[in-house]
Amino acid sequence: MTQPGPSTNTGPEFVREMARSFWYSAILRAAIKLDVFALLEDRALTYQEVADSLGASPRYTQAFLDCCVVLELLEESTGKFTNSSNASSFLVKGKDSYVGDHALHHTNTWVSWGRLDEVIKDGKTILPFETGFVDPDTYWTNYMTGQHNRATSGQSRQLVENVDLRDKRNLIDLGGGAASYSIALCEANRQLKAVV
């Protein structure tokens, strides 16, 4: 496995790297779904300890954790694995900066993207839950919590910093989802009342 990102190859490796790039998001998705980052937050574990905690195959767990190291999701020292600073900041559930649900939402669309040739020819969108990859409840839950992740991980702060509502009293938020942005705007502008 090689490091993700833009390839500097100009030969056939350029095509090979592009073709296998979805592996990286598959590794990220698995780590999020297995809650590996919560398990390794503030502690170092061997692959066997991780496998035991997950009830997983030690052999496959070791290979998986090694891939996470290559992708800089985890760090390894003397046979023990810990979160990288990015994983600790953005992939541990419960932190305001968590964006794991947003990543799950994107990976829920794999099968649809895998059929892009059909979409182009037929001119019809294929929704992820129409493919059977995820059920509608999971898709929409990941979508909504993913949008909330975006807000709490910095976008709502940017909105507050760039929109002056000091002289406004009312806000109507159409399509406001979890009201993440409205909450941030109202907290920054105490006179503001929002209807979502």
Q: Where do the model's predicted regions map?
A:
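Preference for long, well-ordered alpha-helical segments
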Residues: Y139, G177-A178
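Conserved SAM-binding motif I beta-strand of class I
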Residues: K193-V196
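Conserved SAM-binding loop of SAM-dependent methyltransferases across substrates and taxa
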Residues: A178-Q191
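Conserved class I S-adenosyl-L-methionine
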Residues: D167-G177
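Conserved Class I S-adenosyl-L-methionine-dependent methyltransferase catalytic core
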Residues: T2-G5, P12-K33, A38-A44, D52-S53, ...
